[in-house]
C-alpha cells in the first residue's frame, strides 16, 4: 500500500475549505493567490460584513477560520468578492478607503480625522494644532498625529517626564514668573524654570525628543505617481499631499484622477510616507501645469 504524503499547507487549505459554510464553497475555489482586497458580504448589497487585504488573497481568506469572531462573521456571509492590486501598497490603500466608505460591521472603524491634531514647535513653545485648520502636508515643525487634543498633550507630558522638561514652560501647567515649578523640587524637572538650565538648552532637548515624531512635509510641488508592479499587473498610484487619489494602469490616465486634495489623510500618510521616501519605487512627478488644469 502506497501512502501519499501531502504538505501541511495543502492539508490546511483542504481542511479550511471543508470547514467553511457550504454556501461559500464556490467562492473559495476561485480565490486568487495575488495581492488585493477581499470583501465578505451578508444580506446587504451596500454594507459588507468585513473588508480585508493581503499579499495573497486566497491564503488570508482561508485563515479566517482561526477565531470564534471570524466564524460568526462567516456564518452571516453570503458571498465573497475581491479586487486584485499590483502589490501590498495598493491593497493597503484600497482597504483603508473602502472601510471608510462602506463601514463594514466586523471592521474596526476608521475615523475621518475630524479632530486630528499634532504638536507644533514654535521657537521654544509647543502648541496643539488641528488638521482642519492647518495643512499638515505643508506646515513645518509638526510632530505626532493624534486623534484629539488630550492624546497630544499626554504624548507631550510623557516626553517631559522622560527628559525632565518643565511642565510650565511647555504650557502643561501654570508657572509663576521667577519661581521654580513643583517638579523641580522633586528633581523631575531639570530647572529651566528657575535658571538651573538655560531656556535654549531646554528648547534643544525638547526638539531632539520630538524629532522621532516629526510629520514629513510633502516633498513635491504637486502630484506624483508611484509605480507598483506584479507579474500580472502594473499600477500607478496617484498621490498628492499624502492623499491617495486612486490608481491607474498607465501614466496617460493620471490626469483623470488629479484634483485638489480634500484635507490631510492620516491613513494615507502612514501607508505612503515610507515607500515614497525609501527610494525603492519608481516615482514620477506629474506636470504641475496639467495638475492645476485637471483639479
UniProtKB/Swiss-Prot annotation:
Keywords tagged on the record: DNA damage, DNA excision, DNA repair, Excision nuclease, Hydrolase, SOS response
Name listed for the protein in its UniProt record: Excinuclease cho
Database matches in InterPro entries: GIY-YIG_endonuc (IPR000305), GIY-YIG_endonuc_sf (IPR035901), GIY-YIG_UvrC_Cho (IPR047296), UvrABC_protein_C (IPR050066)
Function: Incises the DNA at the 3' side of a lesion during nucleotide excision repair. Incises the DNA farther away from the lesion than UvrC. Not able to incise the 5' site of a lesion. When a lesion remains because UvrC is not able to induce the 3' incision, Cho incises the DNA. Then UvrC makes the 5' incision. The combined action of Cho and UvrC broadens the substrate range of nucleotide excision repair.
Any one GO biological process: SOS response
Domain GIY-YIG residue range list: 33-108
EC number assigned by the record: 3.1.25.-
One function term, GO molecular function aspect: nuclease activity
Gene Ontology cellular-component terms listed: excinuclease repair complex
Amino acid at each position: 500500500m502506497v501512502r501519499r504524503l501531502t504538505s501541511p499547507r495543502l492539508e490546511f487549505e483542504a481542511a479550511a475549505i471543508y470547514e467553511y459554510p457550504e454556501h461559500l464553497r464556490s467562492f473559495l475555489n476561485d480565490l486568487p493567490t495575488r495581492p488585493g482586497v477581499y470583501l465578505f458580504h451578508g444580506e446587504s448589497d451596500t454594507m459588507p460584513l468585513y473588508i480585508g487585504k493581503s499579499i495573497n488573497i486566497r491564503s488570508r481568506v482561508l485563515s479566517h477560520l482561526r477565531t470564534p469572531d471570524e466564524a460568526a462573521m462567516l456564518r452571516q456571509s453570503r458571498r465573497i468578492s475581491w479586487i486584485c492590486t499590483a502589490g501590498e501598497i495598493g491593497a493597503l490603500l484600497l482597504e483603508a478607503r473602502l472601510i471608510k466608505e462602506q463601514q463594514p460591521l466586523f471592521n474596526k472603524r476608521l475615523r475621518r480625522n475630524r479632530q486630528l491634531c499634532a504638536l507644533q514647535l514654535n521657537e521654544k513653545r509647543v502648541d496643539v494644532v488641528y488638521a482642519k485648520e492647518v495643512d499638515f502636508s505643508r506646515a513645518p515643525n509638526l510632530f505626532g498625529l493624534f486623534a484629539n487634543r488630550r492624546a497630544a498633550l499626554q504624548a507631550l507630558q510623557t516626553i517631559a517626564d522622560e527628559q525632565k522638561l518643565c511642565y510650565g514652560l511647555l504650557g502643561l501647567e501654570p508657572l509663576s514668573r521667577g519661581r521654580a515649578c513643583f517638579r523641580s523640587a522633586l528633581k523631575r524637572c531639570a530647572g529651566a524654570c528657575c535658571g538651573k538650565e538655560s531656556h535654549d538648552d531646554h528648547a534643544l532637548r525638547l526638539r531632539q525628543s520630538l524629532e522621532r515624531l516629526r510629520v514629513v512635509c510633502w516633498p513635491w510641488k504637486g502630484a506624483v505617481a508611484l509605480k507598483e508592479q506584479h507579474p500580472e499587473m502594473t499600477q500607478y498610484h496617484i498621490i498628492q499631499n499624502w492623499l491617495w487619489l486612486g490608481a491607474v494602469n498607465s501614466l496617460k490616465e493620471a490626469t483623470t484622477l488629479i484634483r485638489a486634495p480634500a484635507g490631510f489623510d492620516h491613513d494615507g500618510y502612514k501607508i505612503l510616507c515610507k515607500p515614497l521616501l525609501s527610494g525603492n519605487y519608481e516615482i514620477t512627478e506629474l506636470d504641475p501645469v496639467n495638475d492645476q488644469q485637471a483639479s
